[in-house]
Amino acid sequence: LTLLRSVQVSNMEMHNGKWNRFFGRRLSEITIGIIGVGRIGTGVIRNLQGFGSPKILVNDILPKYSLDQDFNIEWVDQDEIYQQADIVTIHTPLTAQTKNMVKKEQLLCMKEDAIIINTARGGIINEQDLYEVMQSGHLSGAAIDVFDFEPYYGKLREIKRCILTAHMGSMSVDCRTRMEIEATEEAVRFLTNQPLEGVVPEEEYAVQREGL
């Protein structure tokens, strides 16, 4: 939303004594591509329902067609997401399959005014390729919360239309408290031979076994 409405640019200009107003786009009028439809990706789909009826394209290595009963989504391959989406948001784990999944080839397939978001894991988007593509003027914005190496001091800091945050996705007191409670409760269930609630599906675990 910040990138769609140039909020970060307006904020900087206001602090510099400038009064400029920017045309943006409404979320309900664009196409959103979601790569990775696990718990978080599904949550993104759910949250988007409050913004009208954007077209939602989704892709996952293990499609969950049951979601079609609750949401108006379209399952497509990744290439179609890169080519059609106005916003591409990544919600996959970092695996051998997703390492450098988004390279220059994929970025240049995106619309010139598209936006890409990565709040999943560093290393999924090739940072050097993203820098070079954005430096050339392609893409209207990027929002990156995770990096190959953290703390991040790389070249993307030079790109003003690239919003960078310091891996802050779970950085709220209530979220961290909930994480600690859930981890403790799951450990207790394991140690007392009770059914577990956070089991990784075997098919996903098989992918993780392949390593990076």
Please give the residue ranges for each predicted region.
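Phosphate-coordination loops involved in phosphoryl transfer and adenosine-cofactor binding
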Residues: 28-31, 53, 104, 113
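Structural/interface elements that position substrates and couple domains in central-metabolism enzymes
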Residues: 4, 57-59, 64-66
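Glycine-rich Rossmann-fold phosphate-binding loop(s) that bind the pyrophosphate
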Residues: 37-38
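Phosphate-binding beta-alpha-beta segment of Rossmann-like dinucleotide-binding domains, i.e.
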Residues: 1-31, 43-46, 51, 196-201
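C-terminal helix-to-coil terminal segments
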Residues: 150-212
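Rossmann-like adenosine-cofactor binding region
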Residues: 62-155, 171
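Short, structured coil segments at secondary-structure junctions
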Residues: 52, 71, 158-160
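Conserved S-adenosyl-L-methionine
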Residues: 50-55, 136, 140
